[in-house]
Amino acid sequence: NDITVIDSNPDLVGQLTNSLDISGITGCASHPDVLESAGARDCDMVIATTQSDETNMIICQVSHSVFTIPRKIARIRSQSYLEINYSDLYQSEHLPIDVIISPEKEVAEAVISRLEIPCAFEIETFLGGKAQLIGISIDSTCPVINTPLRQLSQLFIDLNAIVLGIRRNTKLFVPDPDDQIFGDDQIYIFTTLEDRIRTLEIFGKVIQKGNRFIIVGGGNVGLTVAKKLEENKQNKVHCKLIELNRKKAELAADSLERTVILHGDGLDLNLLEEANISQANALLALTDDDKTNLLTCTRAKTSGCELVLSLVNDSSLNSLLKPMGIDAYINPRSTTVSSILRHVRHGRIRAVYTIGDAEAELIEAQVLGTSSLAGKTLRDIDWPEGVLVGAVMKGNEINIAKSNTVLDEGDIITVFYNSEVVNKVEKMLEVGINFF
């Protein structure tokens, strides 16, 4: 790929060009001359992710009108621009944006997904909603610790689940069949939805959904999460939202129907007790300040809250999560990056999910008839080191990959791999320089 980054900060451009194999331009990305200097006339795609919605819109408009760039992706944060009533705004004859990425919406959906499996610290759905990647922490009570993964496959022969990754002492690696799971490991399991509960039980985890939640932070993410919780008609939710800024608290009160709004500091123990923190099933720390989120979670945990979830923007803080008692976290940047990557990869790549701080990826792709993979068994394919195929979907049937599984044209496969081999994996899956 030939990638050019445009930014108004010359120091940032310098850092990127020195550390990555990319080109850089300093300037305003919405200006036609700057875009042209970046190679817009020969560009296949523009991704506008500045801090300004309006700038991102202009970038897409100029890219379309002046340079006829075929695909345009924009990050749009303001909820006003995302109202369903105004969806026609983004038609090609009006404002030509092909894909809109809303970070707040993506993060809110990730939060709701975590609440479905409280014992998981990370969840992502694949294969048309029929399978999930689930990250769980292992403790000494796990029934299958110190058991080789090969033996697990033999013990639970009909189980549609596989361990794709293990994080041990902060290092994430793709396991071999003879590797074992130890206490204090974090593991990533790929499983079908049908076998999800049984799989978690094998590793000593039980899904216990709650309906009493406390949200700290009434910004776009907190407000979106509260609205989604209110929409849950099957499980009547009791939700309280704490917001320090009075104007935001008043806006939340006007926007929400059943959520109780508390104006104050989420770190205030008296306020947490007023919110009945000891009886809450989960506290969601969703402010835009990492330290506030982490400290709020720690205070909630020591006050008896069952589950605490934090937004963490700075990945260097990840090593503090376990000592601080944080049960689950969401990195907004990683969530947004994964969303963007779904739309920029080559070949028939249908989905990409970034693991941790870009340590690894899980990719969902279609096997093309002209691909080097078609017609081969998995054991006959020369995969790079650090790659593991999770599942193969043939038609509507999903099966965990075996060494004798044959890949046919049209099959959908999920592949887990270390970030160092991204280009090699993509090369194996693509058949040309075409998006989608």
Tell me the role of every PLM-derived stretch.
Residues 1-436:
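Cytosolic regulatory regions of ion transport systems
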